[in-house]
Amino acid sequence: MRPSKRTPAQTRPITITRNFTAHAEGSVLVEFGETKVLCTASFTEGVPRFLKGQGQGWVTAEYGMLPRSTHSRMDREAARGKQSGRTQEIQRLIGRSLRAAVDMKALGENTIVIDCDVIQADGGTRTAAITGACVAMVDALNWARAKNIIKSNPLKFLIAAVSVGIYKGEAISDLEYLEDSAAETDMNVVMTETGKIIEVQGTAEGEPFSHEELNELLGLAKNSIREIVDVQKSALN
């Protein structure tokens, strides 16, 4: 039995609130149960130096956790003077995932910077961030089209992400912290709205897992992501 009494395939209640802040071209508060992440998308003209003159755009991401997003306060990384390896890994994952969803030529020489700030953490912050950031990015792209900065829609498809894992011998979806911290296997899956895989991060925390268990986890993720994309589409409509 899961701590939350959810069924193995059941995600937490998911809500996406658009236009959560006033200034960003796209802004979203995404909530997976008690995990809450603010995602903003800033549209800027110009690209990094390595892309200048190539007629294509760029999407990049930053990620951070507020000091009291966790059970006990942690220092701000700015105060420590450097980002942790975890932070760097997560923001690269977010950036890679979102770039897969965008036609960079259609974006032109423009950049979208995604900022994901975890307000409250209860497991699955990176997958929630990807899910919310995609919606914020859609709003930023629509803003640019409305301003005639770009002519066509660079979005190829929606993407979303979910955590899956093996907890007490059972494959489960959308792990909260109590499950994540005790899982035998922990996996983060990013997919397109049609179920194609963008990224899989999987680790045997306790016991090695089999090919059959891997396939079961990917099937679980695919079904959950289909539901999450429905939430994204509902928010965008």
UniProtKB/Swiss-Prot annotation:
* The keyword Thylakoid belongs to this UniProt entry's keyword annotation: no
Report the InterPro entries cross-referenced here: ExoRNase_PH_dom1, ExoRNase_PH_dom2, ExoRNase_PH_dom2_sf, PNPase/RNase_PH_dom_sf, Ribosomal_Su5_D2-typ_SF, RNase_PH, RNase_PH_bac-type, RNase_PH_CS
CDD domains per record = RNase_PH_bact
Q: Which residues bind phosphate?
A: R86, G124, T125, R126
Any one GO MF term held by the record is:
3'-5'-RNA exonuclease activity
As given in the record, the signal peptide range reads none
Q: Pfam families recorded for this chain?
A: RNase_PH (PF01138), RNase_PH_C (PF03725)
Q: Which SUPFAM superfamilies match?
A: Ribonuclease PH domain 2-like (SSF55666), Ribosomal protein S5 domain 2-like (SSF54211)
**Superkingdom assignment:** Bacteria
Keyword set, alphabetical order? Nucleotidyltransferase, RNA-binding, rRNA processing, Transferase, tRNA processing, tRNA-binding
GO BP term, example: tRNA processing
Q: Which reaction does it catalyse?
A: tRNA(n+1) + phosphate = tRNA(n) + a ribonucleoside 5'-diphosphate
Q: What is its EC number?
A: 2.7.7.56
**Which HAMAP family did the record assign?**
RNase_PH
Family indicated by similarity: Belongs to the RNase PH family.
| Subunit (UniProt) | Homohexameric ring arranged as a trimer of dimers.
User: What role is this protein assigned?
Assistant: Phosphorolytic 3'-5' exoribonuclease that plays an important role in tRNA 3'-end maturation. Removes nucleotide residues following the 3'-CCA terminus of tRNAs; can also add nucleotides to the ends of RNA molecules by using nucleoside diphosphates as substrates, but this may not be physiologically important. Probably plays a role in initiation of 16S rRNA degradation (leading to ribosome degradation) during starvation.
Kindly give the PANTHER family that the UniProt entry links to this protein: EXOSOME COMPLEX COMPONENT, EXOSOME COMPLEX COMPONENT RRP41
* Annotated protein name in UniProt: Ribonuclease PH
> What organism does this protein naturally occur in?
Shewanella denitrificans (strain OS217 / ATCC BAA-1090 / DSM 15013)
